[in-house]
UniProtKB/Swiss-Prot annotation:
Cytoplasmic side: 201-208, 279-297
Organism: Rattus norvegicus (Rat)
UniProt family annotation: Belongs to the TMEM178 family.
Annotated protein name in UniProt: Transmembrane protein 178A
Transmembrane segments: 180-200, 209-229, 258-278
Chief site of localization: endoplasmic reticulum
Biased composition (Low complexity): 68-79
Domain of life: Eukaryota
Length: 297
């Protein structure tokens, strides 16, 4: 096999690996995870002996879980259909009253991606029970459209406006992330097709075009991943912090889906670099050979 064809085959292999990793990242939900077990243990130690025996070993006692004492009202206000409630929707329904203590927040282990946010099963028996009984949904869709939140009397109007503006900015960041990832997949697919065509027609030209498409895919992936990181940071630092931020002892971070996306970015940049750099390297070698022959003559 000629060196140019070998470089094209290597670039095509890297680009196909990149495409597989990128599609895996897009359609899996493990971009970001939270684990409040350490926070739960510290709350249990600080609250030792304060609760009845049947309420121990819980992050939040069941008697104080949101809407348990008044299910008819809760079912009218909560989204997601009749008879369903999101254990974290209490944030928007209770206002700021019961959030001054970190241990008063019902935090559960979650994982989220571009399209859904889900609760881990088998970690907290409270959320397991709620999901098995059909009271809570295990997964909720990530919003890509703006919906007007409920106006509550116990939240100041100015704070409501700030929350709405933050929701709007966060929505834009999510749209940018998903949009650029979609464009990256489309351009990468075109690059793979052009690289395949280069085996049969105008090898030098098509290889160069494929390299440009691969590098363009890398730019789109970089924009998307940086925007996703910005959206996560923005969401955790929203006002008021006692609602949206996480306690310091809650473990949270990026997971394997976003690692697949970063690996995809590395592969596609390598593929684009090979396709773009090889013609220049080969021309330099030819020029050196010609100059060597002329000098010997």
């Amino acid at each position: 096999m000629e060196p140019r064809a070998l470089v094209t085959a290597l670039s095509l292999g890297l680009s196909l690996c990149s495409l597989g990793l990128l599609v895996t990242a897009i359609f899996t939900d493990h971009w970001y995870e939270t684990d409040p077990r350490r926070h739960k243990e510290s709350c249990e130690r600080s609250r030792a002996g304060a609760d009845p025996p049947d309420q121990k070993n819980r992050l939040m006692p069941l008697s104080h879980l949101p809407l348990r004492d008044s299910p008819p009202l809760g079912r009218r206000l909560l989204p997601g259909g009749p008879g369903r409630s999101d254990p974290e929707s209490w944030r928007s329904l209770l206002g700021l009253g019961g959030l001054d203590a970190e241990c008063g927040r019902p935090l559960f282990a979650t994982y989220s991606g571009l399209w859904r946010k889900c609760y881990f099963l088998g970690i907290d028996r409270d959320i397991d029970t709620l999901i098995l009984k059909g009271i809570a949904q295990r997964c909720t869709a990530v919003k890509y459209h703006f919906s007007q939140p409920i106006r509550l009397r116990n939240i100041p109007f100015n704070l409501t406006k700030i929350i709405q503006q933050d929701e709007w900015h966060l929505l834009h960041l999510r749209r940018i992330t998903a949009g650029f990832l979609g464009m990256a997949v489309a351009v990468l697919l075109c690059g793979c097709i052009v690289a395949t065509v280069s085996f049969f027609w105008e090898e030098s030209l098509t290889q160069h075009v494929a390299g440009l498409l691969f590098l363009m895919t890398g730019i789109f992936c970089t924009i998307s991943l940086c925007t996703y990181a910005a959206s996560v940071s923005y969401d955790l630092n929203r006002v008021p912090k006692l609602i949206y931020s996480l306690p310091h002892d809650v473990e949270h971070g990026y997971s394997w889906s976003i690692f697949c996306a970063w690996c995809s970015l590395g592969f596609i940049v390598a593929a684009g670099g090979l396709c773009i750099a090889y013609p220049f390297i080969s021309r330099t070698k030819i020029a050196h050979l010609k100059s060597g022959r002329d000098s010997t003559v």
